[in-house]
Amino acid sequence: MEHQVIFFQGTDISPAAHLAFAQAFGEIDEPHPIYPSVDGFDRIVKLENNSDVPPDTNSWHTDLTYKRVQPFASILVARSIPELGGDTLWSSLYAAYDRLPKGMKSDLAGLEAIHDLGDFRNTFSDSSTNTPSEDRLNDALPRFGHQVRPLVDHHPVTGRPFLNFNEAFVTHISGLTTNESNSLRVWLANHMNRPEVQIRWRWQAGDIAMWDNRVTMHYAVADYYPAYRCMNRVTVVHDRRVPN
């Protein structure tokens, strides 16, 4: 658990091998409620953008924290990459916590954040059938609703504390007024958006990134439109090292 994201460069991994690799680490997540799947592999999410399907998640986020069980890891394979742009950044939630002022660590202890899929409607554009549509999102909302998670949590394997904040899905901090909650959310987002706690990856076709989804946020930079970009992602729900 020394590294929160690792990379494999220039592979020719097939969808079947991608899925098998992910299964070695734990249970695979169900098909994504909004994004399409790779043909013949419903557990592999197809993230495809071009001039007709612009990028739709141009924000920092941790995957699927609105679900009851927050996924353990994501494994992303680059299938087609634009000549310019399309990088992905990761932010360490360990480092974000470590860099908090001592008083802020004390203030955040015991606070809880509401992670809600409904806020996702503000981060996507509905321009084609391949982009998340309003109908598909609305269909997913009753199934997932929201989850309440501590703002400061501890990794189940390492025990290290981390800042459990997800800019894309956290809609409110429990126990605070709306103004207090909004101010704290902005402060936390700015605190985590620092180069000192980030890594940036310039993709080549065949590259693989695997990251610990519990202690990172990531940002797919949407600077390549209208060029074509295609990525495949498998999400691992449960870490085999952690008892159910």
Where are these regions (language model features)?
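Non-heme Fe(II) oxygenase catalytic core, chiefly the N-lobe of the double-stranded beta-helix
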Residues: 1-208, 213-244
